[in-house]
Amino acid sequence: MHLASLFAQRVDASLRFAFPDAPSPALVEETLRLAGLLHDVGHGPFGHFFDQEVLSAWGIDHEVIGRRLVAGELADVICSLRASPSARFEPGEQIDPMWVAWVMADTDIEGYRPPPWLRALKPILCGPATVDNLDYVPRDAYMCGISLGAIDVRRIIHYTFVSGDTIVLHAHATGALEMFLASRLYMYLQVYHHRAGRRFDLSMREIFRETVVELLPGNPLDHAGEYMRLNDWSLFDAVQRWEDEPPGSKRRRLAEQWARIIARDLPWYLAYETIPRRDADLGDAQERITRAVAGSAGDVRIEVDIATARVAPHNPMTESGMVNIYDPLTGTVEHARTAELVSRLPQHNQVVRVFTDSPQMLRAVHDAAASVLQS
């Protein structure tokens, strides 16, 4: 929320020059603050893992649920606000919950047309350097004891302004943006997709959906109350209580499997890890590795896990996929400068790891994976 305030205050003058009918600075600021606060309100237990393993069955994700909550259950609270930390709104002003719902996620909302001033501000919430990732990357690095290169958040904010109908970054800040993207990539590869975390993901995947079925009666859009009460801690509390269920029952079995995971008694072992070539065909990698090791492996299970880090996600507000760069030498917004900046960084970096449930077969699986993935 604090970074949203800093962005709002910094771009205010240029926003009003481009959109004279924009609402008061306080209302714009609080709209962005709420979007920063609530953009992940739709997450279930274990964040994006819940999206992949549970919500995908209904064709939705946490952003769909978050927008539903903002426009529904939270709408009255949002409409009741009359000030930001900086100032009170103008008389008669209030935040439209749909503004918050629209600006906090990438995709458009069918049938909804946001005001032009809000559309211009969307890259502050959805882009390569947002109030979200500018906050969590340095914070997570600090909490994990990782020393990143300098992340000059204030420089990025200082050189951000509205030009035409979108957010623009002055060329003087391209170095700061590039350093931030490099730090973000490092965190994804070394922390968010760490091999230990992926072992936990594989282990939980075997029981996660089955566990959630016991706690959530159906689609969260139809059971908002139950969904809002479901979080990491309520799940842990439930599976701990299931240890008292009768032996042999489904809940007792799930409780015992969760107990092993919590104790780090994980059934998956890392056998091989590589960053593949950009042109590598990974579509049938698991099948090829399984065939290569089948002669000596017996009944061993193999999982090929592809962890992906996108450092420049598609930004629907610009054709280039990145923030537009203002070139002071020409006085124009240069899309070519954006392409030049992006070309310096991996656009789609992958780490491929091969896991097996047999510690005795680690070497055989390693050699098979190497022969397949390096060929």
For the regions a language model picked out, list residue spans one by one.
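Sequence-structural signature of the catalytic-core scaffold of metal-dependent phosphohydrolases
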Residues: 1-34, 42-263, 271-273
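Terminal helices and disordered tails flanking the catalytic cores of nucleotide-processing hydrolases
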Residues: 205, 215-375
